[in-house]
Amino acid sequence: MAGHSKFKNIQHRKGAQDKKRAKVFTKLIREIVTAAKTGSSNNPENNPRLRNALTAARSQNLPKERIDKAINSANDSSNNENYTEIRYEGYAPNGIAIIVEALTDNKNRTAAEVRSSFTKYGGSLGETGSVNYLFNHCGVIQYPINIASNKDILEAVIEAGGHDIISDDTTHTIYTDIENFSKVLEFLTGKYGIPEDSYIGWIPLNTIIIDDKEKAEKLLKLVEVLEESDDVQRVFGNYELSDDVYEIIQGEP
């Protein structure tokens, strides 16, 4: 995972996501409902996916009453709302590989929306499996840099069973095997509290540096449009903005 310390560049700008809190809440609620319905139990103690979903929801300050409502909705036998997990893969301009993870109640609608977004911004949607070999599928847990020293959090990650940690100026990013994700998340939450973010995702094995402002803006617009869909849970790409381009874009209104 070395070389991916600028994690903020890989998954688009967090500030842009924060402005869309209503959509973030919608995505979190879908995951809670799906986890409660598809898991072995609606008790988070016995359902790791639901436990992880609740941790993610709390990290984004999803109100407790909305969490409870989502779980109750999943338990309601008259509720026919079911979501299907789908992964879309394709290329953005300049050979950037993109993975889109979705939870949808209408696969045809979501596929059309995702394909249209790729086409509109100069990309192309491929078959499932066309780019995932360029990524590592793993658990990701993020804490603010001031939560602990690099040494202390590294020791905690090793004890918990995580396999890597990268720290930059603002964030400790911990990586885990998928099978250990829930255990590591629970251990670190007990030690440091709820993380800023936690999920199972696709982290690029290598990144392509984007050092042109126009190319970066077009790429980020594609990511933004994809993320605006209620059906899309997360978007991943094997790109990284150069420091200069990142500073220019961050400084724009």
From Swiss-Prot:
Recorded family membership: Belongs to the TACO1 family.
One GO process term, biological-process aspect: regulation of DNA-templated transcription
Keywords per UniProt: Cytoplasm, DNA-binding, Transcription, Transcription regulation
Disulfide bonds: none
UniProt cross-references to Gene3D superfamilies, sorted A to Z: 1.10.10.200, 3.30.70.980
Pfam families: TACO1_YebC_N, Transcrip_reg
Region (Disordered): 1-21
Protein's recorded name: Probable transcriptional regulatory protein RC0681
Molecular function in Gene Ontology: DNA binding
PANTHER family: PTHR12532:SF11, TRANSLATIONAL ACTIVATOR OF CYTOCHROME C OXIDASE 1
Domain of life (superkingdom): Bacteria
One Gene Ontology cellular component: cytoplasm
Matches recorded under NCBIfam families: PRK00110.1, PRK12378.1, YebC/PmpR family DNA-binding transcriptional regulator
Locations listed in the record: Cytoplasm
